Amino acid sequence: MSIQHFRVALIPFFAAFCLPVFAHPETLVKVKDAEDQLGARVGYIELDLNSGKILESFRPEERFPMMSTFKVLLCGAVLSRVDAGQEQLGRRIHHSQNDLVEYSPVTEKHLTDGMTVRELCSAAITMSDNTAANLLLTTIGGPKELTAFLHNMGDHVTRLDRWEPELNEAIPNDERDTTMPAAMATTLRKLLTGELLTLASRQQLIDWMEADKVAGPLLRSALPAGWFIADKSGAGERGSRGIIAALGPDGKPSRIVVIYTTGSQATMDERNRQIAEIGASLIKHW
């Protein structure tokens, strides 16, 4: 068993023998400050990975655009099909120029040879490749089937209605392609620690998230040496930004953190900075 596999297998073991975790209100002060700085709603939740206990939250049951954070849920659905013998990670899918949508840095390089399901999930999560996400959505039956998968998990809040890139439109009061921080955190926890996926599939999902290459300016920028993080960011119209993550000290995840914001006129750099500062406060008062 590799060190990574050992780590994920023992997540419940380590957490079960930790002392109770108590959150600190200082982080919520920073979340509220971020709202003021961005002139936008910010949703935040911090969940204990083992128990599922909510440690802190702000607007946990308000809807926010999912943006590209949905890609983790999508690959969870794909892995569920793999576990059921309905899909193979090594199956190669061919695509054409007509399939390409904006921001497809990986799939645009494979028009001649195609990509395996494993490679598409890696591209969707680590590089946020939009065409990869659409191709994977096709394999499960489209956005409505992802929503059905989530419903079967017990998540009756999170919904995907459209494809990339339209799902990032983020129209105010539009419930399409949205989630709530509490629902997303609970669903992510189930995917990473529950019995829905096999151990191998849970490991694969967290490996893809750990290898995320496009979330550097967010929580990762505030992470001390030796800390673990597996995450997925998202960006959308109308100042929307978000991140979902499993993180913790000593090289292993112990909490789920979800942050969403929408409705800001701030630049992308400023949105990134505010989320990074929330992360810095979280870590300081861990």
Predicted features, each with a name:
Residues A9-P20:
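Bacterial N-terminal signal peptides
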Residues L100-L135, P143:
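Conserved catalytic neighborhood of penicillin-recognizing serine enzymes
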